[in-house]
């Protein structure tokens, strides 16, 4: 008989919660400068120590057994707050820009496929997809059922077949992640290539990658997550050859493709 023994280095979590005063004291001990501790306490009560930790991290020693001491003696708590506020404004600008991209992508996919198939419910046609049909239908169904839009309620109250609303309704309410998955799952044909060209790209795979990357960035913005100095899970493909050149080869070669600037 073979006995399987699972080895683990995990330990119990024993850290205790800190009061606001203790949080200030902890940061002071590590070298952060406070000009007004009462004001800092108010910020910590509104923003949280843990959320701000992401903005102090780059200025601290962060080795395995380090004390997370600040590497510079001139970093003030106000500098961290300024960085946090900058990131918040940056997220707002990014989110507004993504809105334009998202609306354009939804519109083009729906219009091109509805027009070419003559089918209001074309997205239900399994023959249009190269993989992931069942999972995609589950995602679309869940997103539509979760929607509180009046036009979805109107369709459900008036029609019983097909059970799903037409593409211009259903794909209007699915998440951008679901929309990205739909585009990626579609078979490669002239319609998909045409949509890609509308965004100035020559390769469908690049638009698929961009939609996936933008979807991740959108989620960060929507959930108020840090975007400054973040390493994203999906690396962006930066093409050298586009319909409308926007960056020279040297610059492209210097960009870290899992950082915000690439997205």
Predicted regions span which residues?
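Long, contiguous internal "core" modules enriched in hydrophobic/ aromatic residues
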Residues: 2-263
């Amino acid at each position: 008989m073979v006995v399987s023994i699972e080895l683990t280095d995990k330990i119990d979590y024993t850290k205790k919660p800190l009061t606001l005063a203790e949080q200030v004291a902890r940061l002071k001990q590590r070298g952060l400068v406070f000009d007004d501790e009462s004001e800092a306490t108010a910020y910590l009560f509104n923003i949280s120590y843990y959320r701000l930790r992401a903005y102090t991290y780059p200025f601290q020693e962060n080795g395995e057994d380090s004390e997370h001491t600040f590497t510079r003696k001139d970093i003030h708590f106000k500098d961290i707050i300024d960085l946090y506020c900058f990131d918040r404004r940056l997220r707002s600008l990014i989110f507004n820009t993504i809105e334009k991209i998202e609306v354009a992508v939804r519109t083009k996919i729906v219009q091109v496929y509805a027009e070419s198939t003559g089918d209001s419910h074309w997205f239900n046609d399994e023959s249009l997809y190269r993989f992931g049909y069942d999972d995609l239908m589950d995602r679309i169904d869940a997103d539509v059922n979760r929607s509180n839009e009046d036009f979805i309620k109107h369709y459900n109250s008036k029609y019983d077949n097909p059970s799903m609303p037409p593409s211009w309704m259903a794909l209007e309410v699915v998440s951008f992640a679901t929309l990205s998955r739909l585009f990626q799952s579609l078979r490669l044909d002239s319609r998909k290539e045409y949509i890609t060209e509308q965004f100035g790209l020559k390769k469908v795979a690049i638009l698929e990658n961009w939609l996936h990357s933008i979807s991740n960035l959108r989620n960060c913005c929507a959930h108020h997550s840090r975007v400054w100095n973040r390493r994203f899970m999906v690396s962006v493909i930066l093409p050298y050859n586009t319909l409308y050149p926007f960056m020279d080869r040297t610059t492209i070669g210097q960009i870290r493709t899992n950082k915000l600037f690439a997205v």
